[in-house]
Amino acid sequence: MNFVEELRWRGMIHDIMPGTEEHLNKGMTSAYVGIDPTADSLHIGHLVGVMMLRHFQRAGHRPIALIGGATGMIGDPSMKSAERVLLDEATLRHNQDCIKQQLAKFLDFDSDAPNAAKLVNNYDWMKDYSFLGFIRDIGKHITVNYMMAKDSVKKRLSAESSTGLSFTEFSYQLLQGYDYLYLYRNEGCRLQMGGSDQWGNITTGTELIRRKDGGEAFALTCPLITKADGGKFGKTESGNIWLDPARTSPYAFYQFWLNVSDADAEKYIKIFTGLNQDEIAELATRQAEAPHLRPLQKRLAEEITVMVHSREAYDAAVEASEILFGKSTTEQLRKLDEATLLDVFAGVPQYHVERSRIATGISLVDLLADATDIFPSKGELRKTVKAGGVSLNKEKVADAEQTVGEDDLLSDRYLLAQKGKKSYYLIIVE
């Protein structure tokens, strides 16, 4: 199966320029995907382009990841409703280094093979290009009529858009077009890939290559990822799902994939994993037979968490997930780092208690019925303890008068109280 056939069955092709597949079948070639460096981490919205490069390399071709250092200082108007914040060079370089470390989990940069991946930054070839030189060498080859016909430009100039379009952003497609020309000349790059909203910018590049060098270059885009319910992919109430564990814990990352709908799971597992058709078909059959077991979601969450983080991080995320369902021990609870602990218990009621009350030791009855109102009265607490219905840090409480001290704290500032089987309360000691 060739690269285009691979993407096609995975549902990863939106538009493809005629002749692309034939060109790829002739032998090894290079393709690039542009990556926005405005943060020091990729988020899952970037992963479709990254997976396209991964499949490209696995098919024997050479992937190029282009960090948009120069274009990131400007902002792409494609399908965005407002101009964006511009970044300085030091920040962009830092972000580039962080992004490369993440890309290395998907692409082989270090191989001696001729198709080893390469990372480039368009700031390196744009920073010394004078404005006069650029408009003379590049601007004269692309007409304003051609640029105005792009959907991204039309949308920003429409009556519905209150922001208009700055000249800076209008020039973006020329810069992206020049990137393609530069890589065509210097890296033998004949294909640019991206999301379907990038088609206009990509074809500006193929047109520039044709007009400047009389060359032939190609374009391929993937559909923008959506959710079955029409919601925005990759967003939660707390924002983006990042690949950096400091921004999104591996537990929260795992939970995001585990909780996608059945319809989305079948679509996403084709896009975001390397599982083959037979493996996915078998999972889909099992899902249809026993949807409550959610084999698609579980395998999707496993594959992508291991790829982005590690097998150890995945195992820890699964273990953390079991804590809410009563299958865990105090030892497992104590193994959680602070970020994961807060993610696991993000939705439970929280109480704040002064550290001085814990430092000297406080009885459980005073903690749960006086320092907090987890129990309405001390009598109610004692009765529930007697019935075996109270746990602290996943340990059943036998004595309502037991002392709770600093040694009991999780991550040195938390206590987890449990009433019955399902009611959790997080006590934060400050």
UniProtKB/Swiss-Prot annotation:
Xref: CDD domains: TyrRS_core
Segments forming domain S4 RNA-binding: 362-430
Primary localization: cytoplasm
Binding residues for L-tyrosine: 32, 172, 176
Residues that, per the record, bind ATP: 235
KW Secreted (keyword) present: no
Listed Pfam families: SYY_C-terminal, tRNA-synt_1b
Location of the protein in the cell: Cytoplasm
Enzyme class: ligase
Molecular-function annotations in GO: ATP binding; RNA binding; tyrosine-tRNA ligase activity
Placement of sequence motif 'HIGH' region: 37-46
Assigned GO CC terms: cytosol
PANTHER family for this protein: TYROSINE--TRNA LIGASE, MITOCHONDRIAL, TYROSYL-TRNA SYNTHETASE
Cited function: Catalyzes the attachment of tyrosine to tRNA(Tyr) in a two-step reaction: tyrosine is first activated by ATP to form Tyr-AMP and then transferred to the acceptor end of tRNA(Tyr).
Protein name as catalogued: Tyrosine--tRNA ligase
Provenance organism: Porphyromonas gingivalis (strain ATCC 33277 / DSM 20709 / CIP 103683 / JCM 12257 / NCTC 11834 / 2561)
